[in-house]
Amino acid sequence: CHTGCSACCHQVFAIQLSEFLYACYGYQRLHGNIENILNVGSSVYSRLVTEYPELSQAIQKIEFATDAASYQKSSGQLAECMGRIKIPCIFLNSSTNLCMVYDYRPIVCRYYGLAYLPISDDIDKFYICKENVQGVTLSDLVNLDILGDNLIELSLFKSKKYNAVMFDMLFPIFYFCYLFTSGKDNFNFKFEKMKKLSRAKYADSMFERNLKK
């Protein structure tokens, strides 16, 4: 994207916990204490669930989903609700219109709005954001399947409750901020663990190996 273009940064996206932790890790490395950012995000979430009660309802359904069908249905409801919300990302600098964690941003921020080519026998289309039309070659494209597979691999965990291997669910950034500030699920421990693993496991495995820009 062009420097200063933040059209996609005024939408609500769902990301995985590992992505959120990596963005927080990057913010602390670049700007210091992240507590204020988390508090702002938590306040935004509290306001959003008041304006959009279906947002918290969809999130709760996802959290308590017991099978793939109910999870997919609730995820669809969450996506539909998020699509109606236009609000700046907590990591967007309102003065410069620049991302404060650009090198640590989630995957969706790395390909949303950029060109992509669906690989399918019955699809012959090349998509590109009209804000970024300056000429694109196939070498500029990244393999989203590889990135997605790596993200899933890094998000796997063993669930004692279900005695099965599961992966982190997708939630809005603001909801993760709420979880951190409310002290739910011992997120501070997860954050400290992620700081130790982020460079060696997360960045090297996913971003630096498969996405250079």
Residues covered by each model-derived region:
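Short loop/turn segments that flank or connect secondary-structure elements
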Residues: C1-K213
